[in-house]
A protein has these predicted regions:
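Sec-dependent N-terminal signal peptides
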Residues: 3-13
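Alpha-helical protein-protein interaction scaffolds
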Residues: 20-174
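Hydrophobic alpha-helical membrane segments
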Residues: 59, 93-100, 107, 170-285
Length: 285
């Protein structure tokens, strides 16, 4: 760390106008820092390297994007990765990881466009990887028609993502077959029988608890009415409390149905993104 701090002080001025060999040495040192997980220091140095050569500029942009990717600053990472020119040997890796980063932050249309603009030789491994990534992005968009068109080409012939192709097909089936639980229906069900809407929403334990709680309050209120009459303060207070919990039971059931859909979709998105990520690390290792 002392050596790193010393070099940071030494390299406090931008490296513009330096010879190519000097810039290459600085980039080698940056890669050494990255390998030691000194990400902040490596990014500090990269901000100060401004080579005149296009190939070296591509290397700087790639490394900046790569460091930001490791720091999980995915939006900014994609910005720098997309600046790598088509002439660079890092172009393909940059585009694939940029598309993944964009998909991860929800910029699905842009991620799809990045992939669509790439062209490779048919039947090649990287062409199959492109097809796989586009299928995953389509699934994140819930575009099942586009997913099916890409999934036709899943052949399982490349070990880097053969299992992930199978996984994506499974996720597609789960998304297509997922029950569509309506918040309105959940609310109506709980209006008739407290807690039933939560059972409908897939929250059985919560539904049973709600039924018992509202039921117990209702029985208590009825007991006050039977013993003390409708004008008694205990009956009035108990009626008010029961009414509040009854209405809350209806509202809670509607929210539970909506929450269940959100949780399911979020979980599926995380699984898809995970399976999109693994092949990239395997293919470009």
């Amino acid at each position: 760390m002392i050596l790193v701090l010393f070099l940071l002080l030494l390299f406090q001025f931008p490296f513009s106008g330096f010879g190519q060999e000097n810039v290459r040495r600085e980039l080698d040192f940056v890669q050494h820092l990255i390998s030691r997980n000194e990400l902040r220091e490596s990014l500090f140095l990269l901000h100060r390297i401004h080579p005149d050569d296009q190939n070296l500029t591509d290397s700087v942009n790639f490394l900046r994007g790569w460091v930001l990717y490791q720091q999980k600053q995915l939006d900014t990472s994609a910005f720098f990765l997309l600046k790598v020119s088509a002439e660079s040997p890092l172009f393909q890796k940059s585009r694939f990881f940029a598309a993944y980063n964009l998909a991860h932050v929800g910029s699905l249309q842009q991620a799809s466009s990045v992939m669509q603009n790439l062209s490779f030789e048919e039947e090649s491994g990287i062409s199959a990887l492109k097809n796989f990534q586009m299928a995953g992005i389509a699934l994140l968009q819930r575009d099942f028609e586009s997913f099916s068109l890409n999934a036709i080409n899943f052949k399982g012939q490349f070990n880097a993502f053969a299992q992930q192709e199978i996984n994506l097909k499974g996720y597609a089936n789960q998304l297509i077959d997922q029950p569509r639980r309506s918040p309105a229906v959940a609310g109506v069900l709980s209006a008739f029988i407290p807690g039933l809407g939560k059972v409908y929403a897939g929250k059985t334990a919560e539904g049973i608890a709600g039924f018992l709680y509202v039921g117990a309050l209702g029985l208590t209120t009825y007991d006050f009415y039977r013993r003390l009459g409708p004008k008694n303060a205990f009956f009035i207070l108990s009626s008010a409390v029961t009414g509040v919990f009854y209405i809350g039971n209806i509202w809670g059931s509607a929210v539970a149905a909506r929450r269940q859909q959100i949780e399911f979709n979020h979980e599926m998105d995380q699984r898809i993104l995970f399976d999109l990520h693994i092949p990239l690390r395997n293919f470009f290792q």
